[in-house]
Structures are given as structure tokens and as C-alpha cells.
């Protein structure tokens, strides 16, 4: 992700429907530019624990979203992943492709043992992406986050390294 990507990022980050289940947004232009700066600043951290990436449709050379994987607990080799897509690209398999790519990177390059993700119980599309990607729903975190003026539940999904290897084939 680069500074000049801010308009493409802001196209989805400022869309109330896209960010409906997110902890953030809808973004202003300033907030989107700050997000990109934060994402870029983590590239040089040693050790690097955050990887925020642009989702690009290569055939169109178009940025359609962002995703990331973060090493949340290095001692236990645990990380979490997330993604956000421009709604014009929902339902086309990009979310599943991105989630699987992040898992592959997490297990092969970052040597993680466990990768998890959360989603709002109302976000059935994201739950479907996580399940289709090979994650299992482990439970519901009840009122575990304060977001947009209210306590919200999250479904917790995870996959273990030994579960990924056969799933990847």
C-alpha cells in the first residue's frame, strides 16, 4: 500500500455499508490517509509483526481493498487476520482468496501455529468467507468490544497449522 492509494482506499473505507460491521469508519479522507501512513510505517519494524497489504485485481490494476495479518503473540506463534473489500467486488471469491493467501503466508513465512479472525454475528458473508477458507468457529465473544456506541459480540474463528496443511492441498 502506497500514499497515492488513498483515493481507492477511501472509496470503500468511506462507504457506510462496507464498514457497517467494522470497528472504524466511515472514514474521512484524513482518516484514510492516516491509515495508509500507519500501514506503511510498520514495514520497517524489527521484528515486524504487522503486515497490511493492498488487495489488487491484477487484470485491471485496481486496488479493491486491504487486508492484513498481525502476529499478536509471538511466543505462542499466534496471529490474526482481517480484510475489507470495496462492495463492488463482494461475492466474487476475492475474500476467500485473500483469507487463504494470508493463512498461507502466516503458516509458511511467519511460522505461526494458530491464526484467528473475528466477525460480527450479523456479518454472514464474512463468516462464510472464514469457514470456506478452512477456519472453524470456536465460539462467541460476548460484548467483547465497544464499537460505534454499543457493546458488540464477535464470532471467533481459527485454524491451526496442522489443519491448514491438508486443507491447502
Each PLM stretch: what is its role?
Residues 29-30, 43, 164-165:
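A short hydrophobic/aromatic micro-motif that marks alpha-helical segments and, especially, helix-coil
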Residues 1-17, 56-169:
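Acyl-donor (CoA/ACP) binding surface of acyl/acetyltransferases
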Residues 49-55:
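A short glycine-rich, hydrophobically flanked beta-strand micro-motif that places a catalytic Asp/Glu
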Residues 43-49, 135:
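Short loop/turn motifs at secondary-structure junctions and domain boundaries
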Residues 17-40, 53:
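Conserved GNAT-fold acetyl-CoA-binding loop/helix
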Amino acid at each position: 500500500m502506497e500514499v497515492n492509494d488513498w483515493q481507492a482506499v477511501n472509496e470503500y473505507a468511506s462507504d457506510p455499508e462496507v464498514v457497517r460491521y467494522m470497528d472504524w469508519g466511515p472514514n474521512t479522507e484524513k482518516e484514510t490517509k492516516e491509515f495508509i501512513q500507519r500501514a506503511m510505517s510498520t514495514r520497517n519494524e524489527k521484528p515486524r509483526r504487522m503486515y497490511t497489504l493492498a488487495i489488487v485485481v491484477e487484470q485491471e490494476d485496481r486496488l479493491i481493498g486491504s487486508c492484513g495479518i498481525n502476529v499478536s503473540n509471538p511466543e505462542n506463534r499466534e496471529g490474526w487476520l482481517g480484510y475489507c473489500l470495496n462492495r463492488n467486488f463482494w461475492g466474487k471469491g476475492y475474500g476467500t482468496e485473500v483469507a487463504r493467501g494470508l493463512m498461507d503466508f502466516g503458516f509458511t513465512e511467519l511460522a505461526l501455529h494458530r491464526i484467528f479472525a473475528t466477525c460480527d454475528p450479523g456479518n454472514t458473508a464474512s463468516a462464510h468467507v472464514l469457514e470456506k477458507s478452512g477456519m472453524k468457529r470456536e465460539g462467541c465473544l460476548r460484548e467483547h468490544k465497544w464499537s460505534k456506541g454499543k457493546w458488540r459480540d464477535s464470532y471467533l474463528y481459527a485454524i491451526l497449522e496442522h489443519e491448514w496443511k491438508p486443507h491447502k492441498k
